[in-house]
Amino acid sequence: NLFNSLARIGSCENAGDADCRPTIIANTPQELRTQLQSIIRQIIAEKLAFTAPSITATIQEGGSLYQAQFEYIQFGEWQGSIFRSELRPDKEVIQGLDHEGNWSSAVSLREQILESSSGGTNDDGRNIWTVLPNISYLGNWNNFTTDDANQDAINSLMGRLNFSLLDYHNSSSECSTSNRGTNHPSPLGADVGQDGTADEVAGLINFIRGQDYFDYDGDCVINELRSHIQGDIYHSQLIEIGAPDASTQFTDNNQEGYFRMVNGYTNFKLQNKSRTNIIYAGSNSGVLHAINASTGREEWAFVPPFIAAKLPIAINPLFDGRGPNGEGGSNAMFGVDGSPVVHDVLMRGLDSQGELEDDPTWHTILFIPYGRGGSGFSVLDVTNPIVEPSRGPLHLFSVYNDYIRKIVYIADEEGNITERAYVTNSVNVE
């Protein structure tokens, strides 16, 4: 038709050329914005290149050196990992995964999933959680799943910031039955050409959990484990949190050391002296990883609610079958891209059951800015960093500033979201 002809003239010389672009069809302003963003991200992906893995963050703790690295992927999520290397007293660094005690978080994560699923169960061994209204994460810290109620709540969350879900797999896409004989050898996975975006919601959830929803390997099996799962850790600096160690020394009563001393911080240190050391790092897959500093295994992963709302950005139908052998792809995005900050705070916080305490107690609070992932942040209580049936990390609140629509979104401890419109140059918080 006329529009397809105009699209062809504006993008390529001859019909059928690899750089030809289809007509943009959008039914709403939000869908048009998402479509245009997908095209812009495709153009950037085609022009961008890195020649080698990049080291983006380094911390030194005791006898360990931790380094975050990522590798650029042109039409997909960039691949990241944290490497632990032994650091000897003479400052010699012993690298290599064959050295005892060294690990790669990306390798450990994939092994963790394979070990958990080897018994034929659907358990992938991960605790991935967020905050959803009326769906508590307490007890298992694993509500970022495709269970009906969870998926419906996550779907509602994805529409909160006006990002539209695009239909990646449909009746005419690369992995549909209509393309089987032409573009792919047999045998192949089940037909995944479902029209509509219900499968995209489940697909994004499963992609976060490690499945190959976008068919990176081109075999049209979209429920298999990807060869690499952890997203890139780019601007987010690593932080290690173990036993509380803030100072109680002071020279006058206006110092924080004095405040700690007179308010029972020493008892808090004693009660948590054996607390497991955890590496916290934000990745652009959209999660905050909590990684055991000794083993490299992921203890849990938190998807901030306002980052979950932006996950539709990853979908780009223009990457469907974009690879030389029909491989699919997705947009690289900024997720949890800020650097976590920790502090021990005396306050009326939440108890292990998520209820407000009667009196102030000490808590280890983790502040998680989104960085380039968006103008927002989440605040967690990581006093108890290991998931157990009766205790674990707690969400306190999250905030997102939509400076385009002039709205501040606030998610409370249970995931209930309120909207506050700008008032002149301030925000109404009453």
Which residues does each predicted region cover?
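A fold-level detector for beta-propeller and closely related beta-sheet-rich head/sensor domains
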Residues: N1-E430
